[in-house]
A protein has these predicted regions:
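Basic/aromatic-rich interaction segments and small domains that mediate binding to polyanionic partners
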Residues: 3-81
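Intrinsically disordered, low-complexity linker and terminal regions at domain boundaries
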Residues: 83-87
Length: 87
C-alpha cells in the first residue's frame, strides 16, 4: 500500500486498541515511564495494518501503550508487546 493511502487511513480512522478485558489491568502490574522509548510498531486501523515509528509510554507483562504522530495528529493505542520492536 502506498504512503498516500496509508496517510489517508490514519487521518480518517482511529487505531484499534486492546480492550480492557485483554489488558487485565486489575490483575497485571502497569508500568509508566517518564522517558518514552522509541519503537516500531504494527498498528491496526480496522482491517488495515500500518507499521509506525512511535514511543512506548507504558506496559504490562503482555501489552504496551504506544503513541505516534499521524497526518491528523497524535494517535495512541494499547498493543500486544510482540507487535513492537525497539528502534
Amino acid at each position: 500500500m502506498n504512503d498516500k493511502i496509508l496517510e489517508g487511513v490514519m487521518a480518517s480512522r482511529v487505531p484499534t486498541s486492546l480492550t480492557k478485558e485483554e489488558l487485565e489491568l486489575d490483575e497485571q502490574p502497569l508500568t509508566r515511564t517518564p522517558s518514552p522509548q522509541p519503537v516500531t510498531a504494527w498498528v491496526r486501523y480496522g482491517e488495515t495494518a500500518v507499521k509506525v515509528d512511535g514511543l512506548l509510554v507504558a506496559w504490562t507483562p503482555r501489552a504496551v501503550a504506544v503513541r505516534w504522530e499521524t497526518p491528523g495528529g497524535e494517535h495512541r493505542a494499547w498493543l500486544w508487546s510482540s507487535a513492537t520492536r525497539p528502534r
